[in-house]
């Protein structure tokens, strides 16, 4: 809309009717004009509608139910059935709670508290893999932290808020996305208090770190320097609310079973005395399943920290059969990975005989490294073969026996008369 006054063409907003002198900016279109105030109003209307649609989508989005979560975990993690069930329920409830918060505007509605998770199990039992698989399944930001590198703020070492900084980096400093992520803190047992009694001296890497983690795990607004770096008084910070971040803590807790036994098994003399089991390895998992908060406090975690981790899942020590399953059954099993790698070397087949798989599993048991040690055993067994194969012609198949795993003889090479298949790029 326009009109001439004193030789000057006066322009008006086509929506609100204000003149160009009454507004800051007037934008022209084909025979129409819109002012900055109307643009801002339109943006507000669109923003509200988009937020409403996104909240509805979030509420209706396909959050897998515990049974479905368990089935997906089964594809990657062998055994640990009870731990998978506990994790499936805990993670489902956590993200169901977030979806309820997204669509709820009633201030009087019952507030659902967050339940963080503690995983207890020996090295190589699958604690880290469970957390990684859950994050991948739910498509949320995931970050791992090592508790042994953490210290209190002001001391040499890694500040606990650095964990949130890593989470922000994973999602390109999108605070909203980071606030729905998963943080896995490994080796949490290594920050246990050195004795039952509070120390007179400062314990900056033990009880001090537990105190520093308390608020972060429970829920606080962490101030993180943008794009990393150290904090400076005059710089702007990215504010991240940790209330809805799911924290999963894991640790081996060596010696915890002794504390549980001491509490649960009664000593005595005569006919009424309880007989203590001498086969500690056999019922190791059963003992750990009986863990109580008081046992964790006795181990060295402060009561407030134990209280922030209400969901406790214990993982079994892996036996020979479980290790063989780990080698062969999961979607990304190690044997499948090496078979694919050999097939890339001109279509060569790689076969592991049953005795070879047993030998690999036994080696891992001797090393007490669980599933984590399987790859290094395979690398050692296949090193010479992987070194020689690219220089050999017409190899069709490589067979691995228990003697190859033990280092007695080299793997068996089966040759073909046909020329080698060209390598794929």
From Swiss-Prot:
Belongs to the ClpX chaperone family. It comes from Nitrosospira multiformis (strain ATCC 25196 / NCIMB 11849 / C 71). Keywords: ATP-binding, Chaperone, Metal-binding, Nucleotide-binding, Zinc. GO terms for cellular component: HslUV protease complex. This is ATP-dependent Clp protease ATP-binding subunit ClpX. Component of the ClpX-ClpP complex. Forms a hexameric ring that, in the presence of ATP, binds to fourteen ClpP subunits assembled into a disk-like structure with a central cavity, resembling the structure of eukaryotic proteasomes. CDD domains: RecA-like_ClpX (cd19497). Coiled coil: none annotated. Zn(2+) binds at residues 13, 16, 35, 38. Gene3D superfamilies: 1.10.8.60, ClpX chaperone, C4-type zinc finger domain, P-loop containing nucleotide triphosphate hydrolases. ATP-dependent specificity component of the Clp protease. It directs the protease to specific substrates. Can perform chaperone functions in the absence of ClpP. Residues 1-54 form the ClpX-type ZB domain. The keyword Transferase does not apply. ATP binds at residues 122-129. GO terms for biological process: cell division; proteolysis involved in protein catabolic process. It comes from the Bacteria. The gene is clpX. GO terms for molecular function: ATP binding; ATP hydrolysis activity; ATP-dependent protein folding chaperone; protein dimerization activity; unfolded protein binding; zinc ion binding. It holds the Pfam family AAA_2.
């Amino acid at each position: 809309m326009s009109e001439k006054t004193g030789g000057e063409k006066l322009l008006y907003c086509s929506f609100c009717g204000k003149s160009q002198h009454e507004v800051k900016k007037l934008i022209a279109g084909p025979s129409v004009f819109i002012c900055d105030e109307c643009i801002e109003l339109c943006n507000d209307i669109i923003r509200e509608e988009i937020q409403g649609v996104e909240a509805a989508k979030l509420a209706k989005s396909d959050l897998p139910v515990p049974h479905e979560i368990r089935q997906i975990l089964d594809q990657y993690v062998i055994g640990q059935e009870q731990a998978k069930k506990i994790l499936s329920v805990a993670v489902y409830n956590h993200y169901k709670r977030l979806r309820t918060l997204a669509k709820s505007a009633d201030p009087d509605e019952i507030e659902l508290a967050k339940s963080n998770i503690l995983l207890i199990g020996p090295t190589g039992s699958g604690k880290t893999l469970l957390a990684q698989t859950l994050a991948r399944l739910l498509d949320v930001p995931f970050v791992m932290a090592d508790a042994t590198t953490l210290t209190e703020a002001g001391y040499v070492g890694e500040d606990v808020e650095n964990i949130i900084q890593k989470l922000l980096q994973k999602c390109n400093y999108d605070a909203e996305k980071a606030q729905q992520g998963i943080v896995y803190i490994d080796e949490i047992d290594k920050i246990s208090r050195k004795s039952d009694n509070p120390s007179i001296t400062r314990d900056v890497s033990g009880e001090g770190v537990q105190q520093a983690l308390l608020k972060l795990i429970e829920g606080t607004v962490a101030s993180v320097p943008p794009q990393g770096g150290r904090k400076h008084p005059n710089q702007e910070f990215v504010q991240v609310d940790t209330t809805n971040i799911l924290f999963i803590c894991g640790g081996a807790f060596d010696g915890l079973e002794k504390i549980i036994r001491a509490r649960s098994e009664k000593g005595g003399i005569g006919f009424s005395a309880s007989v203590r089991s001498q086969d500690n390895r056999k019922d190791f998992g059963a003992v750990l399943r009986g863990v109580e908060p008081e046992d964790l406090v006795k181990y060295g975690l402060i009561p407030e920290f134990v209280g922030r981790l209400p969901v406790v899942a214990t993982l079994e020590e892996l036996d020979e059969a479980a290790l063989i399953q780990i080698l062969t059954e999961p979607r990304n099993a190690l044997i499948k990975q090496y078979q694919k790698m050999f097939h890339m070397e001109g279509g060569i087949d790689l076969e592991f005989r049953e005795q070879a798989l047993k030998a690999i599993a036994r080696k891992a048991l001797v090393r007490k490294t669980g599933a984590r040690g399987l790859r290094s055993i395979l690398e050692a067994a296949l090193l010479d073969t992987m070194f020689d194969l690219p220089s050999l012609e017409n190899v069709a198949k490589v067979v691995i026996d228990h003697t190859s795993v033990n280092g007695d003889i080299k793997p068996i090479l089966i040759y073909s008369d046909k020329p080698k298949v060209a390598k794929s790029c």
